[in-house]
Every structure is written in C-alpha cells, then in structure tokens.
Amino acid sequence: MKPLDEFLPVFEFSERHRLAIAASPGRIDAAVREVSLTDIPAARVLLWVRRLGRPYGDSGKPFVAGALESSVVLDDVAGEGVVLGLTGQFWRIGGGDRGPRPQTREEFLAYDRPDACKAVIDFRAGPGLLSTETRVHVPDRAARRKFRRYWLVIRPFSGLIRILFLRAARRRAEAPA
C-alpha cells in the first residue's frame, strides 16, 4: 500500500511528478528536507503572486520545515520520505480555514468539514528516483466547483513549482559531499 492510500484513498484531484537522481534514497530524502525557496527563485515569485504580494515566510527556511506551519506530518521515515496533510478552502486567500486545523494524524483523518478540502503531499525517495504526489479530496459539491476553478488556474504553476523543487533537490543530492 502506498502511504497516500492510508491517508486519502478517495480524491478528486491529483498531481504527480518524478525525477531521476544519481544518489541513494537517504541522500535524496535529506536533499528534499534541505531545499528552500532560495534554491528556487521562480517558485518564490509564483508564491508571492499566489499570496497577492504577501511574502511566504522565511525563504531561507527549508520548504518542508516551513510547510509544517500549515500542515501536519502524517508519515515521516528518514531515508524514504514524508507525507504532509493540509486542510482548508484553498481557493481562498490564506487557505480560508476559519476553524482549528488538525494538529495530529488522528485529527487529520477525522477532519470532515464538507465545505473544505483535505490534501496530502508525498515526497518519496527511492533508488535513483524522487517523486512527489498531491491528492485533494473535496466532499461537498459546491466546494468542489470552487476548488475546480482554482485548480484549473493554479495547477500549471503548482506543477512548475514541483518540477523546480525536484530539480533543486537533485542539485543538492548530486552535489559532491
């Protein structure tokens, strides 16, 4: 079973990317955890636009560590990968989540606001390969329509950020020690 199947087996939207990397899974996983927005200037610009000019936190902080401020770690195995869970109305500026966000795996699994999304993001290191997969579940029909419009606009840019992230991780993983 894939880690994502445990956390979000039902989803309406998804995105996957993968990249060959000449390094061990442990080195690839370590690189994923070190990549920051300073490694990906174009991503910093895209996130700035997404946030309507508001900065995206500390651009020197590793992206995965920064993501923990708005997500919950669902699975984390050193040398293999990490799965993050997010909730909210992503089509709204700031994510739109007015209620408390899940703080634990159990709270994430139990989260069931019909007007909000549940999303999982997986960064997975394997022999010579790094992959990322995002899944989003939107249970409510009206919310799904709103998210679909958002997804149509944001997905190409989200995909570009993921590809740039994978390339930055590859540069770090393949760099001489």
How should these model regions be labeled?
Residues 104-157, 169:
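Beta-strand/loop substructures that line and gate deep hydrophobic ligand-binding cavities in soluble
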Residues 1-64, 68-74, 78:
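Hydrophobic ligand-binding cavity/cleft-lining segments
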Residues 170-177:
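Short, highly charged C-terminal tails/helix-capping segments
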Residues 29-31, 85, 131-133:
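Beta-strand residues in well-ordered beta-sheet regions across diverse protein folds
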Residues 12-20, 81, 118-120, 129-131:
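Intrinsic-disorder/low-complexity, polar/charged segments enriched in Ser/Thr/Lys/Arg/Asp/Glu/Gln
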